[in-house]
Amino acid sequence: MRTLGELDYLLGVSDETRLGAMRFRRVGEDIFQAPDRGVPPVVELGRLLQVTERLLRDEETDEDLRLIFAPGSSLGGARPKASVIDQHDHLSIAKFPKDNDEYSIETWEEVALRLAERAGIETPHHELVQIAGKAVLLSRRFDRRGTARTPFLSAMSMLGARDGERGSYPELADALAAHGARARADAEQLYLRVVFSVLISNVDDHLRNHGFLWQGSDGWILSPAYDLNPTPVDMKARVLATNIDLDEATCSVDLLESASGFFGLQLSVARKIIRGVAEVTKTWRDVAREVGSREAEIRRMESAFEHDDLEKALSVG
């Protein structure tokens, strides 16, 4: 039996849901490689949720596998998810809960997305829906404009890094300076996102969780922010997965200030950003209640938001 290589996995992804603008077809053929079954509509969310639950219990049927894998997904990740077509006919990602989750990961990602928007961070169109009493997060694909496809590049690919390599935000700022269509504005936006990650303890900010969109001959721009997940300190220490400066990733307002020059920012501007983001993130409880989070979960998540860095950030400038 032949061992599958990287090309096999690349070609095994559905053309309809393939990330970015890469498409493949056989020499001499006009039709792009695609499965016989299309992406399910959003009305299938209940069924998809049941399928993911059976998959996680190793109780899936052949029909379950056909439903959830036929459209394919090139997005990866450790959480259960599926591609769906939303009510406005847009390709979207549905993120599902796990039975053993200590708290609703999807609900708190919605909280983070709302806070991010209010802090001035660009996010995808998103919606939290309840299916059979469980929260499912819908996130619209930002590499699609109708039927048009926008080339996408992860930060890992942009830096030529490999899995397990930390990388750093200054390196991403350098990449924007070299290849960016709006380098100065995106460097500031990138800094804003680093500050936000520090203040909400978004510690899974690895290089696959940042991306760039191609703007033709102008170059690349930052994609909308995605996979924003506040994490309580008892689950993971407040250390980012990507370095804040060239060497250090520990969440710290002092480190944010000292690293600001890498993003082309004067310290006064950086402090204004830090204070502004803190004024937003301090409202996290109100936003959590907006989305229907239970009080027990709000208490469970407190350490992700309430820490010395928040107090310090509110006092800078």
Label each region the model flagged.
Residues M1-L207, G211-G317:
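Phosphate/dinucleotide-binding and metal-coordinating scaffold of catalytic cores
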